[in-house]
Regions:
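Aromatic-lined, polymer-binding surfaces characteristic
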Residues: 38-42, 46-59, 80-230
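Boundary at the C-terminal end of the N-terminal hydrophobic targeting segment
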Residues: 20-23
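N-terminal alpha-helical scaffolding segments that mark the starts
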Residues: 26-45, 55-65, 69-75
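Hydrophobic helical h-region of N-terminal Sec-dependent signal peptides
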Residues: 5-18
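N-terminal secretory signal peptides that target proteins for export/translocation
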Residues: 1-3
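Alpha-helical structural motif
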Residues: 7, 25, 75-78, 204
Length: 230
């Protein structure tokens, strides 16, 4: 199951039911989005292990296979592997951050891993909830991404793929973000302009909905909802 798509639909539902609430309707929408984002969609540990393997440990080029990795709570062994590969400088030692290929673009794995770890960090039911090692990794990972500015020859990564993962990560750790961390992230997410057609239109609407949740912009969230259902 596509966790981000489910979270998007949950946000739309909460938006329609919370519009008349005087106590910050976007707080409810935002929390609903995070609650659904951090869920694991694997029925048991065996399925989780299979999902991770089938996704080639987050390296799959196929969008559906990649979603297997980000839709579960990573097994403890995989979490420890990622912690072990992570350099104090904010990057993973097995990723080529200078890669610019159109398809299996290596730097995207950086955000895929951060998203998967943020799920565990933000979920109160996870054994890794609030873990200092993961928390430090997430902030260092953001700083490295902002400074390195990886880029692909494929427009999709810059306008859709990167903003999609980054926005979800920022929402899951929103309460811990510094002003500069949020501002730099928003500059990247703003590359997602409304438009295009088909699934790309839906993805762009989702990215703008997340941007609205990050900035408390109810008008933008409503516009994204209208783009989604229009």
């Amino acid at each position: 199951m596509n966790g981000l798509r489910t979270a998007f639909l949950a946000a739309l539902l909460f938006l329609t039911t919370a519009r008349a609430c005087p106590a910050g309707p976007l707080d409810r929408v935002r929390q609903a989005f995070v609650d659904v984002s951090v869920m694991s969609y694997a029925p048991d540990g065996e399925a989780t292990e299979r999902f991770v393997r089938y996704s080639d440990y987050g390296r799959a080029n196929d969008v559906l296979l990649l979603q297997l990795y980000t839709s579960v709570h990573l097994p403890d062994g995989e979490v420890r592997r990622l912690l072990g590969l992570f350099d104090a400088g904010g990057f993973w030692s097995d990723i080529d951050y200078d890669d610019r290929t159109r398809g299996r673009w290596q730097p995207s794995l950086h955000l895929t891993r951060m998203y998967a770890l943020a799920k565990l960090y933000a979920d109160p039911a996870s054994a890794w909830h609030g873990d200092g090692r993961i928390g430090g990794l997430l902030h260092k990972g953001l700083a490295y991404w902002y400074a390195k500015k990886p880029s692909s020859l494929n427009w999709w990564h810059g306008e859709i793929g990167v903003p999609k993962k980054l926005a979800a990560i920022l929402l899951m750790i929103r309460g811990e973000l510094s002003g500069p961390e949020l501002e730099q992230g928003l500059r990247i997410i703003e590359r997602s302009r409304f438009g295009r057609t088909g699934q790309n239109k839906v993805w762009l609407a989702g990215n703008n909905l997340m941007r609205g949740l990050l900035t408390d912009d109810e008008a933008l969230v409503a516009q994204a909802r209208d783009q989604k259902i229009g």
